[in-house]
Amino acid sequence: HHKDSVKEWLTKNEIGKYIMIQFSGGQPQMGFNANNQYTNINPNRNYQPYLAQQVVNMLREEYKDTTIINCVLPNEPHYNDTIRCDLHWTQLHEMLKDAEGFVAIDSCLQHFSPSANKAGVVVWGSTRWTQFGYSHNKNLQFHMGNEWDEAKFNDSDPRNNMVEPKIILDEFKKIDKTKPVACATK
């Protein structure tokens, strides 16, 4: 069981309350080589690093006593005023259970959210939350708010994931921690 190793990592890093973030992904952890340049088979899923840093800054300002944990592989972007988490993905799942919430793209944190019983904000790029998302999360995309409109979706539009950082922060603040999580979207 990973609960003890997660607690040890949090204690070692002097972390109390925390929010988890994941703004890039698409690389398998299995067989990962840190010396490889970061590549992603679907880069339109990733949130722009410039905007991601703004989200981090806003979260730090709003939640001053809370650590921001960046859940990425070593060759993926890192953000100022966060701590990089180097734990195995199964430990990230365990860690998510006690997080204050998360902000992520369509990657492992959002997929762990139902079984970890945790809601968060998910920024969608070239994938559909109606296929891969969960209704307990705040699902956001540039062309639409938290309601899906298939007529506005084009998977090759590079603006899809360019959601304003302030909108992400506002939606994070609206997460209802008492609402049960779902198994899939509507």
Residues covered by each model-derived region:
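Hydrophobic beta-strand residues in large extracellular and virion-surface proteins
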Residues: 19-21, 59, 68-69, 140, ...
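Alpha-helix C-cap/termination motif
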Residues: 12-13, 62, 98, 178
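Leloir-type glycosyltransferase catalytic cores
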Residues: 1-9, 136-186
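A nucleotide-sugar donor-handling region in carbohydrate enzymes
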Residues: 1-20, 25-29, 184
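Histidine-centered active-site microenvironments of extracellular/periplasmic hydrolases
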Residues: 131
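Active-site donor-binding loop signature of nucleotide-sugar glycosyltransferases
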Residues: 23, 86, 125, 142-145
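Donor-binding and catalytic core of enzymes assembling or modifying cell-surface/extracellular glycoconjugates
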Residues: 32-126, 137
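Short glycine/proline-rich turn/loop motifs
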Residues: 23-40, 151-153
